């Protein structure tokens, strides 16, 4: 973690104080949580968009905590899950998806995740035909990925020590 020890200690003390003083409201908290959860649409699917040879969309399910990204070739019935947040998050204490970007030729996926809670995202590049990571991960980015039109590179930004996007890089 990037927290200073005195900040961490203060936050832990505040959390303990809150826990102690809110103990009597545990049942109310559970009921409120259930009510709010009941209003959330757990099964959802985005609109499909057409791009080159595929149509792309995303969906969430009751069973999962994270979004699945899907695609289907025009004229075919087979649906391909090209990125599954629940699979990616498995075994991690923290997981946040940054960006999911398929190359213009539909062959390569660049995506970013934060698995530490630091809000620094790591970018991975995956071959969609075999699912293998094909590049070294790019560390401490802002998370956004934009493919160049020629599919030979993409753009991303790095964060400075104050967590501000500082420079744009082409990879």
Where are these regions (language model features)?
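Beta-propeller folds
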Residues: 1-171
């Amino acid at each position: 973690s990037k927290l200073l020890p005195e900040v961490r200690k203060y936050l832990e003390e505040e959390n303990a104080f809150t826990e102690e003083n809110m103990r009597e409201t545990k049942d109310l908290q559970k009921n409120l949580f259930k009510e709010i959860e009941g209003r959330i649409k757990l099964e959802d699917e985005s609109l499909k968009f057409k791009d080159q040879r595929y149509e792309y969309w995303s969906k969430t399910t009751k069973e999962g905590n994270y979004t699945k990204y899907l695609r289907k070739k025009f004229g075919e019935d087979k649906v391909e899950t090209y990125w599954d947040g629940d699979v990616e998050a498995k075994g991690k204490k923290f997981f946040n998806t940054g960006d999911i970007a398929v190359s213009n030729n539909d062959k390569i996926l660049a995506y970013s995740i934060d698995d530490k809670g630091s809000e620094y995202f790591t970018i991975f590049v995956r071959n969609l035909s075999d699912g293998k990571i094909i590049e070294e991960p790019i560390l401490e980015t802002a998370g956004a990925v934009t493919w160049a039109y020629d599919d030979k590179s993409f753009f991303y930004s790095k964060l400075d020590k104050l967590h501000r996007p500082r420079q744009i890089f082409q990879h």
